[in-house]
Structures are given as structure tokens and as C-alpha cells.
Amino acid sequence: MVFEYDPDKSTENKRKHGIDFGDARRLWADAALVEIPARTTDELRWLLIGKIDEKHWSAIITRRGENVRLISVRRSRDEEVVLYESEDI
């Protein structure tokens, strides 16, 4: 899988949320990674919820051909953690 992202946005994401997009690629190592279509009106995007080092993280991505473009990553909200931990997915 090929990841793409804006390096400046990755740096800003690290400053704001404590994780850059390079480290966020580790979400895909989580066998329980949850992927949900995000509510958008323009480009198709997905919300991913997974764990890195036992912490829940949420990412917004889009797909460009075979590539995955990281748009943002942050610590998961409480309701996202509940969704991740749910067996109803």
C-alpha cells in the first residue's frame, strides 16, 4: 500500500495532535482497524479507528487510485472508541 500526504500538514498534525502521518501509517497494522464512510459532499472519505501502542486514534483518509491519502489523524473521541470496541461492526 502506498501512502501519500502533505508533509507540511503532517508536521502541523504532529504539533496539534501529537502524531505525524508517517507514524499514523501504523494504524494499518491493527487487525481490528475499523473503516467507516465519512460524511462528505465532495470527495469520498473514510474514518478509520484503530490502535497504536494501545491508544485509540482516528484518521480521515481518501483513496487516489491505489494510494491512500492521509488527511488528518487525532486521538479518537469517546464514541469512536465505543464503536471500535463494539462487536456489532
Specify the residue positions occupied by each region the protein language model found.
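Ribonuclease/tRNase effector modules and their secretory precursors
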Residues: 1-89
